[in-house]
């Protein structure tokens, strides 16, 4: 996914940074995370990509190749706490406002080009992937200092309080904390977890 080329086409300049957040599958424990149960998810190679550059507009200027008809959406910093727009940008705005409330200091604007290869509605957590991507972008470029588990909780808060989805912690956790070739046994009640190898060899999992 060449997001740098797409960034240049949309914003007329070169991207300064690239980011990626995976999707996830869950091997055991469907619909148990929001009840405090155990889950066994792992991150996958498909996910959401971003190319990012700075602007001087004190705004987030956002474009998604997955929603080209929407075009570029501007979210001025002064509008972060306005109502959601029922667009994909609500996930970006939600993460930005939660992080701002937690102490993040956005010192300059960003142009952001996003392209994901996770099918919408396929159970691979495209929305959580976008949330963790945004959290990583803002945490990295504005020296937020937030720990990975804090970003996980920010994503859950966005889903529950801003988007309005009654979801648990598994999706964001699996994406933010995932490791290559390992699944994570997570107790969503205590948040204790351990990594276990997933060595498939010549075997495959059909979902």
Model features per residue range: what roles?
Residues 167-170, 174, 178-207:
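Mobile "lid/hinge" segments at catalytic clefts and subdomain interfaces of large enzymes
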Residues 1-124, 128, 132-148, 153-163, ...:
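ATP-binding N-lobe of GHMP and related small-molecule kinases
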């Amino acid at each position: 996914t060449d997001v740098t080329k797409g960034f240049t086409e949309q914003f007329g300049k070169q991207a300064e940074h690239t980011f990626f957040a995976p999707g996830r599958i869950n091997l055991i424990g469907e619909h148990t995370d929001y009840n405090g149960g155990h889950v066994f998810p792992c991150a996958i190679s498909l996910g959401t990509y971003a190319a990012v550059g700075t602007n001087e507009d004190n705004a987030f200027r956002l474009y998604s190749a997955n929603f080209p008809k929407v075009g570029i959406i501007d979210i001025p910093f002064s509008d972060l706490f306005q109502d959601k727009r029922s667009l994909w940008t609500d996930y970006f705005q939600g993460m930005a406002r939660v992080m701002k409330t937690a102490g993040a200091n956005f010192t300059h604007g960003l142009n952001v080009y996003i392209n994901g290869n996770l099918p919408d509605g396929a159970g691979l957590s495209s929305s959580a992937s976008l949330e963790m991507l945004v959290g990583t972008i803002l945490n990295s470029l504005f020296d937020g200092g937030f720990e990975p588990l804090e970003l996980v909780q920010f994503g859950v808060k966005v889903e529950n309080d801003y988007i309005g989805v009654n979801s648990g912690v598994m999706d964001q956790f699996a994406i933010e904390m995932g490791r290559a070739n390992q699944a994570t046994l997570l107790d969503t009640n205590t948040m204790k977890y351990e990594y276990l190898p997933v060595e498939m060899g010549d075997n495959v999992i059909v979902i």
